[in-house]
Amino acid sequence: MQEQKSLKVNSILNILKTISAIVFPLITFPYVSRVLQPENIGKVNFSGTYVGYFSLIASLGIATYAVRECAAVRDDRKNLSSVASEIFSINVCTTALAYILLAVSLVLFRRLDNYRTLIYIQSTTILFATWGADWINSAMEDFKYITIRSILFQCVSLILTFVLIKSPDDYLNYAIISVFSSSGANLSNVFYRRKYCNLRVTINMQVQKHFKPILLLFVMILAQTIFNSADITMLGLFCGDTEVGIYSTAYRIKSIIVQVVSSLAVVMMPRMSYYFAENDWDKINDMLKKVLSVMVTIGFPCIAGGVSLSDDIVRLVGGIEYADASMPLKILMLSFIIDIFGGNFLGNMICLPTKQEKVFMEACCVAAGVNVILNYLLIPVGGASAAAFTSGVAALVIFIWLLLKKDKRVRLDYILDVIKMPMVGAVAIVLFCSAIKVFKFGFWMSLVMKIGGSVVLYGSLQLGVRNPVVWDMLDLILKKIGRKGESR
């Protein structure tokens, strides 16, 4: 019973954290994108992407591995302190290596001189991430602290954004605020983590024990990062900062929706890992069906809305200067259909809980190679839209690879039954939004009618076709309301 309660509480907390991560960018990015203009937004995003490669070297696969290993010994403070210190010390060494390689790259590649200050600023995220060791909180399932801390720092960053960003020349301030928002919270971990363990740097790092699984996870994450970041990097090299700014705007909008769907894996993965360890395949397949049902019930209407409202969303978020981001956004949203079934479902919900990182790694490596080759061929011709298309191809490669390599005991015969109800609702959203366009309403009236009408239409259809996910959510809401009424 306690296990179920913990899962529900963690789910609610993670939803709150995800919503805050969505709401704050929706508030700040329209303002920032208009003030800084596409060129300066492109500079910040390009340098951030570049630093991201070295951040990956520093982190390896340590965070994912550390959560798994520390969670296994979390009831023994002494053992937890020992394991955490070993992993932390390895992380310190990889961080030092990352900074050395970053310094060498700045000397070798003179084209980066224009981005040097931005790179200095954004590279501090590497230090903060290592120093903070936030994986301890995740291993202890302290989602309450993680959620409150994240929202607090986002609130402060929101205020700083409107105070310190007033002109296009303030793009350095934007970079500093972004670092503070994403990594500043790690500073509080230095004191808070003492609640769980005594973390220190040790010479006895047990490298032979830890390094092989860390390296395997690193290769997987590296491949994921390449096909996620190669688009922006190669756009910057072939097409310039403006095209990067346009693509980044579309990609950021898509990322907001991805966060909502992907957040489910954060809470469900421990439960899936438990069932896999118990080899209870009846519960495994039942849980997988429920997880996929939630993913498509939430994801499909978001995708339909993103495609139908792409022009409106881009205008709302970035302004008319970013109008060219509409087509890349449409392509990215359509490719997310593939990603739901591939990386999110087959990868995060099946491969990782079963410790099949090698299969996931192989899929990501092949996809990364395909993505880079296609980017080289298509970006000089098609720009941001070509970059969006290659991302979709990479997602398709991952899906096909994981589907062919999946455990034969994993049943997928329920997929058509699961997707048919959300698919009906998604098609209805597209048709409804297309009909609204015919009447030529003003921008705000049209936007409100499209969003409001789509929500009502989709919800009504899902209730009408008896979608169990929607009915369970409605039942939960009614029970909460009933309890509040009884307490009064």
Model-based region annotation:
Residues 5-64, 99, 103-106, 157-158, ...:
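Signature of the first transmembrane helix
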Residues 29-30, 59-75, 250, 254-292, ...:
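Helix-loop junctions and terminal segments of transmembrane helices
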Residues 31, 42-59, 216, 231-233, ...:
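Alpha-helical transmembrane segments of polytopic membrane transporters and translocases
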